[in-house]
Amino acid sequence: MRYRLFVRLNCHLCADAFALLCEMGVEVQRINIDRDPALRAQYDVLVPVLFDAERDRELLYPFDAEDVRRFMAQG
């Protein structure tokens, strides 16, 4: 899957970000950073983070629908 959302359990901002992406129709895989020590070290206080695996880019929270659209449109 192209887009990944780095999250952690019981994170209300992560839930908000996922809900926004779902409302926009963005197919995204949620990845719990607490299951991977390397991801936890990289994203510990940054979650939620939207990651584009094809372009190796990140969109840090806070973001809104317009930010996501711009992020997805950038080449």
Where are these regions (language model features)?
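Local sequence-structure signature of Cys/Sec-based thiol-disulfide redox active-site neighborhoods
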Residues: 1-24
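Non-catalytic, surface beta->alpha helical segment in thiol-disulfide oxidoreductase systems
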Residues: 54-75
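Generic recognition of short, well-ordered alpha-helical segments
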Residues: 16-19, 41-42, 63
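Thiol-based oxidoreductase modules, predominantly thioredoxin-like and allied folds used
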Residues: 26-37, 44
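Structural micro-motif
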Residues: 44-51
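Small/polar loops that bind or transfer phosphate-bearing groups
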Residues: 6, 31, 60
